[in-house]
Amino acid sequence: TLFVCLSHSSEPCRGRDIGLIARASHVCGAEAIAPERRQLAAAAPYGEWLIAGRILLSDLPDREHVVHTHASVTRRQQVFGYTEEELRLILAPMASTGIEPLGSMGTDTPLAALSDKPRLLFDYFSQLFAQVTNPPLDAIREELVTSLYNTIGPECNLLDPGPASCRRLVLPFPVLDDDALSKIVKINREGDLPGYQTYVARGLYEVDGGAAALTARLEELCAEISAAIADGARIIVLSDRHSNAELAPIPSLLFTAAVHHHLVREKSRTQVGLIVEAGDVREVHHVALLIGYGAAAVNPYLAIESVEDLARHQVYTSVAPEKAVGNVIKALGKGVLKVMSKMGVSTVASYTGAQIFEALGLSREV
């Protein structure tokens, strides 16, 4: 057991580094630990590994931008239960200002568990906040210590660092637009990034089968993703695109959490990164939940295509389509930072998989 006493130190130490030298059994200042620092820094060419290994999203080749028709956007809005109120009061203000809209005077909407209307799975969860022991951050005035930067890909053994430990795709923001996701889906198509492969899992199930079909499909998807990892996939995209009258989308939160915990049980979670391509995401709370339950990044494709369509037709917003999309992504990302800061979490990397939420009205099985 090592006992440390600081009360007899005569040196001022406020704002200075301190070090714990285990073999000397005492705490010392920055000058005393300088040799150990230099020794650790020179143990390996860490800087060279980082520069050579990091993969920047901006360096990936651009892909074709797809513009969806108004009829296509409207049809999918109906599939995912979009309302006129959400378009007018939530998405349009974000598209115009780049800031999450604020309301006042509370809400008379009943809890999702007590409502007689269909509700999204997101609505059954509420965010936790810091109480006493874990002080929150001020996401505005203390922005310097926060980061929305993340990396994705296989994680190597922390106790055996090497060049492979730095072979990661850098994501500057946790919310991706369609073009950025297209880059990731088609990564290594030209064979320029060996060892990186993306697998897209389609989260759709047969409508006629009901709950039993949903459960069976989730089990199939988990097995499918495990097989993809064994075949070399290092990025998994969980997508609910291409739904139709026969195939309904699985709620993205249920899909993400099921895959995340399956991979944890299989001890293969650190071999891949998860990205969610979801049509049911249109609020900050939705993005925060998906990240909290395992996603490294989220592509709210229908929200993006909706504001792009609104801007093209100058409905509820007067900004250009490209500006509207950028503003929505900015608003959602900054909103996630606000949610994280309420629990004292400063980086999105620490928030990924943290599950700092509570559920009301869901069975233990769900």
Protein language model features and the residues they cover:
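Conserved structured catalytic cores and adjacent interaction surfaces
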Residues: 197, 209-216, 220, 226-286, ...
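Short, acidic/small-residue loops that bind anionic groups at enzyme active sites
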Residues: 262, 302, 324
